[in-house]
Amino acid sequence: MTPTPDAPAAAAADAATGAGWLARRRGALARVALAPVAQAIGRVERVADGIAFVSGLEDTMLNEVLRFEGGVTGFAHTLDEDLISVVLLDPDAGVRAQTAVARTGAVLEVPAGPQLLGRVVDPLGRPLDGGAPLDAAHTLPIERAAPAIIERDLVSEPLDTGVLIVDALFTIGRGQRELIIGDRATGKTSLAIDAIVNQRHSDVICVYVAIGQRASAVRRVIDAVRRYGAPERCVFVVAPAACAPGLQWIAPFAGFSIAEYFRDRGQHALVVVDDLTKHAATHRELALLTREPPGREAYPGDIFYVHARLLERAAKLSAALGGGSLSALPIAETDAGNLAAYIPTNLISITDGQIVLDSALFAANQRPAVDVGLSVSRVGGKAQHPALRAASGRLRLDYAQFLELEAFTRFGGLTDARLRAQITRGERIRALITQPRFRALRTLDEVVLLKALAAGALDAMSPDLVAPLRERLPAWLDARIAALTPALAPPRDWLADDAALDALAESVGELIERIAADAARRATAGMPAEDAAGDIGGAFGGEQARGDADRDADHGANREVSREVSPEASREVSREVSCEVSHEADRDAAADAARVAGRAPGRAEPDRAAPRAMPDGPPRAQADGDRASASRPRPDARGDAARTAPSPQGGADANVDAEAEARHKR
């Protein structure tokens, strides 16, 4: 740059100005009162199993975040007089004795806000789905006080799950805490995921919290929600079994804080905690490692308080606070169905009801395997839709009476027509509440089904056809509603119109007739039982049809054996299968054996000692048939001379029968 003619003058002015600035700065420093600022630095005394014992930080707060040299973080779990037990939130690599520790002055917080929707994060808000880091502009502490009584409102709105047995018998309200409890592998997570998937058409934000689960199981849950539900309105907080115990411990608290962000803004949220049994085991592990005194089943004394202060955060807020709600579906696992264990009894007493899943019902292919006698909702009809409450009035009583009658009739038959009708009705109810996964029903579908059941429209229907009825009902109702709605008519609340609901329920009879006609047409067309059931009834009808086909194949096999073997062996085979087939099948087998021997079937002597079936029971025992066979004439296959033998006790026929009976007994 070429200097200007006034450059010497400008340089002299800058020198004077710089000297003045330096003098002013020195004067300012002379007037500053310097005070020493000290930062407490603690030291690690020992570390083991994810717990570090730190000294030198006497002013540390409970749940305060501490930062170790090297970047590892943890939170203060217990505060003793000399040592602080710090639960590490990261792998403890690099943390050893004499490692420096510093306070941060902040408690554990988690990011919250709309940016979490559709994301998979850990309890600290760190992404696990490979996406971009979250904006931490808004955070909430993981430990927050539950709403006060004056801040709450009554639970009066239903949280629709789409599962008929839950919505009809054990209604869950917005702001309620309903425990899902049962043995391992009884469908607890499946029931909770069905509730999440059904919110795809509602305004509920869902938060799924996985604690100590296998990574593969968590991945299946996420894939199911992404395929059938609305993942853009869900948040997945994952603390798998491989992560640090500290992350597993704070996971449910972080999930509730994320859901509270939406509740406090007048929205509705649902939290599924899977599961609190593993969380209790993690709390026990941390308590034993930090030398807390153990109590019942080695759990510390504050385990009830830990879960109570967590679940009390679920509530329906008053209208003055926006009217938002936070519902909770905690999951707990029992051991051999023991509901009287420590953790199950604690959770049952904390929550507003429980849905008990039974392993025997699950093994009997009843899904969901809800035990009607042990399950309860303490909110129930207060949050149920009026139309659904009216339609399901006697459902639970009728089903409970059916279960009692079914257990009683296993020891004998029924002669009362009224009891037989009650058994038939109970079988229809059981088929109706057996619902496949991801086949949610609308409230209108549930009301119409229950009204049709109460009107007797399903009494003449085979239980195998209930599954196709449930599958085809939504489309059928949509078509009927379109036909009943005038052109350019305003939107109509069909659930509030009793006459319209009755008309829709009556139309179900026509749908049942069509389904039965389709089934009959497929049967007459010779379609295999598996294919017909698959087209009509889905998986459940298919299994029933496969069972019928297997029984038909057994009867056919018995007849083929009777045709191919010798007369003596035919009599022995017929005697052996007489306990398993009906009296008619025995007569067919005898006729076939006579035809093989060259004798007309019409001349065969009737089998007077065939086993008689009890009324709704099995045939008489084999021993009764054997004793009767010694005092009756038996059809022989050796010609007319043998058929006209004067005495069944002697001759060749008696010898053959005695030899066959001896071989059978041996």
UniProtKB/Swiss-Prot annotation:
GO cellular component: plasma membrane; proton-transporting ATP synthase complex
Residues that, per the record, bind ATP: 182-189
EC number: 7.1.2.2
Location relative to the cell: Cell inner membrane
Lipid bilayer topology: Peripheral membrane protein
Site description Required for activity, residues in chain: 375
Any one Gene Ontology molecular-function term assigned to this protein's record: ATP binding
First-level EC class: translocase
Family annotation (HAMAP family): ATP_synth_alpha_bact
Cited PANTHER family: ATP SYNTHASE SUBUNIT ALPHA, MITOCHONDRIAL (PTHR48082:SF2)
UniProt record similarity statement: Belongs to the ATPase alpha/beta chains family.
Role: Produces ATP from ADP in the presence of a proton gradient across the membrane. The alpha chain is a regulatory subunit.
Name of the molecule in the record: ATP synthase subunit alpha 2
Gene: atpA2
